[in-house]
Amino acid sequence: ETPTPTPQPGEVLVRTVAAGVNRADLLQRRGYYPPPKGITDIIGLEASGVVEAIGAGVTRWRIGDEVVALLAGGGYAEYFVAPEGQLVPPPPGVDLVTAAGLLEVAATVVSNMDVAGLKTGETLLVHGGAGGVGTFATQYAKSLGAHVVATAGSEPKLLHCLTHGAKVALDYHGDWVDGVREATGGRGADVILDIMGAKYLEANVKALAKRGRMVVIGLQGGTKG
């Protein structure tokens, strides 16, 4: 048991309805990926709920508002506090349970695709295409008018990639570099969204188109090749 947090100036207290489950949460449960200094040791990087109280100076929210939050931690508790700027309303027609799992992947994908400058007609290579980030990246890229080539490690996951918008799905146990080249008429991918790090670096470079862009958002394959 821990005390219900008190919102400080500029903060909002939210009664939790649902929380997302991310890889970072699973790692913290196993004793890895510790929270930054000064951040609660209660896990949970995204959650949804109802505003219970507001701190001094808060103008965007009122008690009773439904909100979704991106957090440094604390989303798995019955109540959490967050700066008012880290809260957004749930999308129209989306319930709080579903909305709780949107912000982390959405922020990751949208910000990194903005950095990469993905354009209409280009090809995005997504590693881990059946995961939360991979699925959202596929759908977001399609909304921009881009084509998606995704990698995954099993038949069900490859099917998931295809049914969620990937033009081509490649088994990463095979020669996916050749698969990317074939899918792009020999050009290679214009943008790569990579979660593996050093393990895939050499192959990613081979799979890139001339003047392509690669964004590394994870190091699941380590920092050394």
Where are these regions (language model features)?
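Glycine-rich beta-strand-centered segment in the early N-terminal region that forms part
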Residues: 3-21, 32-74
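Cytochrome P450 core scaffold surrounding the K-helix E-X-X-R motif
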Residues: 24-30
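NAD(P)H dinucleotide-binding glycine-rich loop of Rossmann-like/cofactor-binding domains
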Residues: 27, 60, 66-128, 163
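N-terminal Rossmann-like NAD(P) cofactor-binding module of classical short-chain dehydrogenase/reductase
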Residues: 68, 125, 170, 192-193
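Glycine-rich phosphate-binding loop and adjacent beta-alpha segment
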Residues: 152, 161, 196-225
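A glycine-rich helix->loop->beta "capping" turn
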Residues: 183-191
